[in-house]
Structures are given as structure tokens and as C-alpha cells.
Amino acid sequence: MLRLRVFDRHKRLWSVLQSTIRGNNISNHIPNTTCRSSAPPHLCARQRAFYSQNSPKTPNPGSSAGIKLRTRLVVTLLFGGGIIGTWWYVHQEKEKRIQMQRLEQLRKVALGQGDFHLLDHTGQRRTKRDFLGHWVLLYFGFTHCPDICPDELEKLTSVVHILDKDPSLPSVQPLFITVDPERDDVSAMARYVKDFHPRLVGLTGSAEEVKQAGRDFRVYASNGPKDEDGDYIVDHSIVIYLVNPDGLFIDYYNRMKNDTQIAESIRNHMKTFVRLFPD
């Protein structure tokens, strides 16, 4: 009797188990490993936020960050432009001060600032004003000089040829003023200057006129004793003078300077020259 009761109980449990299995999908009892179905919603949200915060961002031009970037660039450009403008103004003012100081120094030296009235090798009366606006290379000598004067005039001619090869530079006017007016008349000067640069102008005059021209440039000249033929040598300064278009002496070159060095010096003067007395 007891066995029958136990058997009936087991039979009922088995029936309940079978009905439970048939009425439910077994897949509902298998755990899903994906975050979307099994993980708590707040955990997935945290993971999405984490990935979003660590991903690279590009500022949108219309965004607040883009506007700030453009503002910084504009401010930087304006600041840099202000610095450059200030530097340029200071530089220009410095150049003006240098020019004025140079003018004052030249006035104190008072070299070559006087006028001259001489005859050129064609017999025309010439003054210093005739050469204003031109760069002038000036040499004092005499036509009977055996070697030094021809050498210096050859060097002067070479300097002018070197500068003439650069079309960006203004032309230079070479001048030759005699220190021996007794022998160097107009015809003697005409014969002499033709052996040098074609633009070379020879200038002569009376003893007093020549002496005054030399005095303005502080030229030393002294006649030596005459020989039995009446010939003599003139001892004089051996200097090539550079005069700018304002008619002011600005540099000089002695015998130690060669043609290349002189040409380079003149080129530098030309590049930095600013008219002090504009027309």
C-alpha cells in the first residue's frame, strides 16, 4: 500500500516536470552574454560615455572653440604687425638721425663745400653747380706728371668702368683739376684727358682760381725747382675724392686703394645715399 502511494507521487511530479518543459522555451533559461540583453542598462550607458570621452574631437568652426581659435589668431597677427610697424618707424627715425649727424659732420669738416669757377678742356666756363645731382670722382694733378698722375687717372678710369657695368647704379662723372695752371692751359688739358675715360672733364683756370679750388679740398701743391730746361715737378696731394649729388665730399681714396676696393666703397655709398638737399 505504501509502495503504491510513493509511485503515484513520483508519477505526478514527472507529469508536472514534463508540462513545465513543454510550456516554456528552453532558450529563456540559457544566459545571454551580450551587454545589451543581460547587463544592467546603467552599465552600458557608462561604457558608451567612456568611449565617447576618449575619442578625438575636431573643433567645429562655428563652435565656441572654433571662434576662440580664430580670435587668438587675429590677436596674434595684429600684435605681430604692431611690433613690425614699430620697428620700421624706429628704424626710419634712426636713419634720419644718422643722415642729419652726417650732414653736421660734413659741415664741420667744410671740405669741398666752396664753389669753383674754372674752364673745362673745351674752353667752357664751369662751376660746381654744373655737377650737382651727379656722383663725382675728383683728382688733382698736372699733365707733366711722369708717373703718379697717369697711374691714378688710369685707376679712376677703371673705377668708372666697373661702376658703369652695373645698370642699377647712377653714372659717375670723373673730373681732373690741374694744380699747374702755368703749363696746363685749355689745349694742354684737351690733349691730356683724351687718353683716359671719355667722360673725364679737365678743368683749369687762372692761378688764383686753381688755388681756390684746391684750397676748398685742402689740397697741398708746391712747385719744385726748375731745371735748366725750365721744367719742374709739382709736389701735391695724391687723393681721389668722392663727391655726392648734394655736392658734398663724403669719402677719399689714397694710393693704397685699388680700383676694385674703390668701386665697392662707392657702390655702398650709392645704396645708402639719401638726398639732403632735394631739388
From Swiss-Prot:
State the Gene Ontology terms under molecular function.
Answer: copper chaperone activity; copper ion binding; protein-disulfide reductase activity
Topology term for the membrane:
Single-pass membrane protein
Q: Which UniProt keywords apply?
A: Chaperone, Copper, Disulfide bond, Membrane, Metal-binding, Mitochondrion, Mitochondrion inner membrane, Transit peptide, Transmembrane, Transmembrane helix
Q: Which GO terms describe its cellular component?
A: mitochondrial inner membrane
Question: What InterPro entries is this protein classified in?
Answer: SCO1/SenC, Synth_of_cyt-c-oxidase_Sco1/2, Thioredoxin-like_sf
Give the record's subunit note. Homodimer.
Its job: Copper metallochaperone essential for the synthesis and maturation of cytochrome c oxidase subunit II (MT-CO2/COX2) by facilitating the incorporation of copper into the Cu(A) site of MT-CO2/COX2. Could also act as a thiol-disulfide oxidoreductase to regulate the redox state of the cysteines in SCO1 during maturation of MT-CO2/COX2.
Q: What is this protein called?
A: Protein SCO2 homolog, mitochondrial
Record organism? Danio rerio
